């Protein structure tokens, strides 16, 4: 079987299975997810041993420490994955709900029913937890899924899919619900993107080049999960102690993830007081790159270049800019943002409302860290990614975002 036939076969199996699985009961889907959670806990040592193969290989290729952190699985993270599957199992699914029903003058009853999308493909990079999250969310929402992870996590993903398949078959269902493309050749992705007859939606989750390639070349409808060039703006009426805690968390709690803050904007009226505190807080932890005005206050900083304002670092680097007004901060963010997550720190209600109304991003915060843009933190159990587009879904993609609707019409012999 050549590469083209291999990928096509995976997609066909998912499509064929989806017709039956889409009508599975909620009880059955919960049972599958409970078994997945149990199997993850029972196979921790196996998962870790396979993950270590990926980690060692990544170290040998010079992968950065922040990206290695994305790849790493340990006892604690596997437990968290298993708990996440349990949370997804307990979520209230909208599949099968009739959200509206109305009667026409001719007696027809017309309703709108929530149904699964069908077959979802997801292309992702070095985070093996996505394998479990994606499978769990698709199963809960009645979808079949085609997984294509990155080559750097191939051993981890193979192990996780094997465990997921064991759980599905233990529950009495076909393992074809979850398909995994083991071929790491990028040509497999090219073939996958052509299969619009079998796959209903494609979700790319990774770096800018992966997303750009998918959006430009996929024949399948795409839900775009964008990069996270996230901003924190500290207003002139901010509580500075609160601001310090939020900026610290947003930047260094986990810099390799898409909801980490990459840019810090500071109002000119508080810059001379606030910036030295930030510099002291981040000294030897974060490389700060400042605008011209910032360098006058903290000359030890590295000078920011134009490309810094649009760069998602995913590392211990942050660019800092002093702004004259909230209006300037909003304009700067809307110009350079990837439309992911932005935050304002202020005690002024009017300014906060202006920021909420005028920032054009998927998640906009007042006095909280951007790190909360996450399916679990939003109460979704997990997420397929963070959508930065506006059509179909925006923000964390949970189970209800993996559905569509169809009309059901009840008649009594009406003709037109």
Swiss-Prot record:
Keywords for this protein: Amino-acid biosynthesis, Cytoplasm, NADP, Oxidoreductase, Proline biosynthesis
Main localization (coarse): cytoplasm
Any one GO biological process: L-proline biosynthetic process
Any single Gene Ontology cellular-component annotation: cytoplasm
Domain of life: Bacteria
EC numbers, comma separated: 1.2.1.41
Protein's UniProt keywords contain ATP-binding: no
Subcellular localization, as worded in the UniProt entry: Cytoplasm
Catalytic activity annotation: L-glutamate 5-semialdehyde + phosphate + NADP(+) = L-glutamyl 5-phosphate + NADPH + H(+)
Pathway connected to this protein: Amino-acid biosynthesis; L-proline biosynthesis; L-glutamate 5-semialdehyde from L-glutamate: step 2/2
InterPro entries: Ald_DH/histidinol_DH (IPR016161), Ald_DH_C (IPR016163), Ald_DH_N (IPR016162), Aldehyde_DH_dom (IPR015590), G-glutamylP_reductase_CS (IPR020593), Glu-5-SA_DH (IPR012134), GPR_dom (IPR000965)
UniProt entry tagged with the keyword Transit peptide: no
Gene Ontology MF terms in the entry: glutamate-5-semialdehyde dehydrogenase activity; NADP binding
HAMAP family xrefs: ProA
Family, per entry: Belongs to the gamma-glutamyl phosphate reductase family.
Role, per record: Catalyzes the NADPH-dependent reduction of L-glutamate 5-phosphate into L-glutamate 5-semialdehyde and phosphate. The product spontaneously undergoes cyclization to form 1-pyrroline-5-carboxylate.
Protein name according to UniProt: Gamma-glutamyl phosphate reductase
Species this protein is from: Petrotoga mobilis (strain DSM 10674 / SJ95)
